[in-house]
């Protein structure tokens, strides 16, 4: 259907037919994960066993076309419903994109057996936090919103009824602080809500700084 109207003194013609939403599909996987493994472990400082855990679970892989890191989110049946792509190069501007057709409720996450849910903006921050605080990490639940939407948080709370505590680990900047306040206002009626703030802008910054400090101490001890 074509609609014709006036905008100011100009004629506006537009097609009102909405295009159907593109069905969700995971990007084709590369034959190996060498570039993504190297990027996450060497450049981002994430623990090898943490990267390996999510890779073995099929929740993290390298795409074939551009060698991006792909973080997969599944529904309660384990069916992939969401994918977040992130460039795996250590130079230039970072590329981040949720794959078209992704269901925002099912972003990258991990379901544990405990009662606490840790909430992050980005998958790399989630993996960085686990690296920083690895003790019994698999007991807890984690979700990376791939942004600041509360939808993935609400979905995790709905599908994991034992959860009663939410720890908001969003970035230490204006957007992260505002989103944390919004989430806390919405959630604190039913849940215990805490704000965990990274010392730097985000948890990966904290991780890389701690690694650099540890290397500096080691060098001083060798002198």
Question: Which residues make up each language-model segment?
Answer:
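Phosphate-handling DNA/RNA-contact segment within nucleic-acid enzymes
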Residues: 64-159
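An exposure/low-complexity boundary signal
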Residues: 10, 14-30, 142-148, 155-157
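Acidic active-site catalytic centers that drive phospho-/nucleotidyl reactions
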Residues: 8, 121, 125, 171, ...
């Amino acid at each position: 259907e074509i609609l014709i109207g006036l905008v100011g003194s100009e004629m506006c013609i537009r097609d009102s037919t909405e295009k159907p939403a593109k069905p969700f599909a995971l990007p084709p996987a590369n034959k190996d994960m060498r570039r993504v493994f190297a990027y996450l472990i060497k450049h981002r400082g994430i623990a090898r066993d943490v990267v390996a855990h999510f890779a073995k679970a099929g929740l993290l892989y390298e795409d074939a076309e551009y060698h991006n890191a792909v973080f997969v989110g599944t529904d309660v049946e384990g069916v992939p419903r969401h994918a977040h792509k992130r460039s795996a190069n250590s130079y230039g501007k970072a590329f981040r994109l949720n794959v078209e057709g992704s269901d925002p409720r099912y972003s990258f996450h991990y379901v544990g057996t405990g009662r606490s849910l840790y909430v992050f903006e980005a998958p790399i921050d989630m993996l960085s936090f686990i690296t920083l605080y690895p003790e019994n990490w698999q007991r807890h639940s984690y979700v990376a919103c791939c942004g600041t939407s509360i939808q993935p948080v609400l979905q995790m709370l709905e599908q994991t009824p034992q959860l009663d505590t939410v720890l908001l680990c969003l970035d230490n900047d204006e957007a992260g602080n505002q989103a944390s306040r919004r989430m806390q206002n919405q959630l604190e009626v039913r849940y215990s809500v805490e704000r965990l703030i990274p010392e730097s802008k985000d948890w990966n910054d904290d991780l890389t700084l701690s690694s650099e400090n540890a290397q500096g101490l080691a060098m001083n001890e060798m002198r």
